Amino acid sequence: MKTLILTIALSAAAFADEWPMHRGGPMLQGRSESAAPAKPTLKWTFKAGKPVVGGASIAGDRVYFGDNAGVIYCIGLSDGKEVWSLKTESAVEAIPLILDGTCYIGAADGRLYALDAITGKKKWEPFETGDKILASASWAKDPASDKKWVLVGSYDFSFYAIDTATGKQVWKVETENFINSTPAITADGLALFGGCDALMHVVSLKEQKEIRKLDAEAYVPASAAVDGTMAFFGSDSKKVYAFDVTNEKPVWTYRDRNFSYFSSPALSSELVMIGARDKRVHAIDRKTGEARWTFATKGDVDSSPVLCKDGALVFGSMDGRIYCVESGTGKERWRYEIGSDIASSPAIAKGLIVIGANDGNVYCIGSE
């Protein structure tokens, strides 16, 4: 029964037409309950101070994101008008986590901020780590109570569980290098995160300790996606991995060419879809690890693709375009020219695509 309850909690975000955190929900599967726009048109543009390299979250009628000038923004989803903003002391590359009316986001100043999602006021004083926070936060319930934890890694080599009510540390796990990925949370209470130690760490939330290390052979710049006991991720080893998290040996590895993966994968029932620095998106059979299709752009694809409910796969490229392709075949539906490098990942909800770019703008794309 406990596993069922946790599964329902983790999946709840995926059934709402929102995008409240990195990859849409704690399993980081990159799935949206919204259909992609049929004929893309620009709805609005918001000018931030510096490049927006992480991405946005969408909750209710608002959009949340940070920029490299260190500003956290809340703007209207319908019109792109600023609602509130908060200046931090360094760049903000993380994607906000919106949970129970609070915006949680880390910054390169080493702090995790908890802000009222409506007003922007601080819920509690920022939680301080020993170094910058570039990864986005996730969340889970305390297995022993109804309390909730924000889970986030830092460049101080530590992974933290923080009480959402108080902002106090509940526990932490120390690693041997920088942590730069968002933790993926499995239905049975495991958190998986990677970093510059070339490992995917598996932490038991119940035991509050690391129980396993998965060898990624090189540093892990992005996040894993999990489904059941399976985890999928890429690394600087130029490979994509599929692990059963109960075992330290991979089920399969995929290597196409000698390029790294700085993108987090999206999962369908059959495919793992991930961007690469060979300027392509790769679709890999979940069971066999064999290539199913690739789609070529004219720039690196660090953007993490999003799978929409109508089967569309949406992602950005450093060639300055947003692409929409058929997830089953890789056939292009449409492309939209922004004209500036896109390293950030799309947030998709209510038929709208919200994405940041290196020109300091956030773009909202909808249907004609």
Protein language model features and the residues they cover:
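Sec-dependent N-terminal signal peptides
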Residues: 3-12
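Blade/loop signatures of beta-propeller domains
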Residues: 17-43
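Short cationic/low-complexity microdomains
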Residues: 327-347
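Short, glycine/acidic-enriched capping/hinge loops at junctions between secondary-structure elements
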Residues: 29-33, 69, 76
